[in-house]
């Protein structure tokens, strides 16, 4: 299922960009994605739009195919990608729920999962995280 609207694709797909070195001028944009739904990651590093990927992840908002316009936006604006495992996503989701008291879907927990999985990478850095997405079925929680 491919989406055509770039704005819709960015929101719904939630590549979950976050900026390291928050401050505007000296920032790095990192795409965060599930390891088992890494079509944007593979597309970014190969500079080729990967369309034959079959994402399998609890982050159901990230199961759709990367759109053409979104791929173009990624190539122009993202500096790198980091992926998170399913267990890292679940742990991040639990932390957001329990400590921030914010109900988010698994897709929205991916950026935090990446940060928590690479503490040495983000040590002593100012990090901004975008949390969005509360489309969640309480009967289908991953724990």
PLM ranges: what are they?
Residues 116-143:
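Catalytic phosphate/nucleotide-handling subdomain of diverse soluble enzymes
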Residues 12-22, 27:
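Short Gly/Thr/Asp-enriched flexible loops that form oxyanion-binding sites at enzyme active sites
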């Amino acid at each position: 299922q491919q989406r055509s609207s770039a704005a819709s694709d960015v929101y719904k797909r939630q590549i979950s960009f976050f900026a390291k070195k928050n401050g505007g001028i000296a920032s790095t944009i990192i795409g965060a994605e599930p390891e088992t739904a890494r079509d944007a990651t593979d597309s970014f590093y190969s500079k080729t739009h990967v369309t034959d990927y079959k994402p399998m992840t609890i982050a159901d908002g990230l199961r759709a195919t990367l759109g053409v316009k979104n791929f173009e936006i990624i190539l122009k604006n993202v500096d790198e990608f980091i992926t998170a495992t399913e267990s890292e996503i679940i742990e991040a989701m639990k932390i957001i729920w329990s400590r921030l008291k914010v109900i988010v879907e698994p897709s929205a927990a991916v950026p935090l999962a990446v940060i928590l999985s690479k503490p040495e990478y983000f040590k002593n850095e100012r990090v901004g995280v975008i949390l969005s997405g509360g489309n969640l079925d309480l009967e289908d929680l991953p724990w």
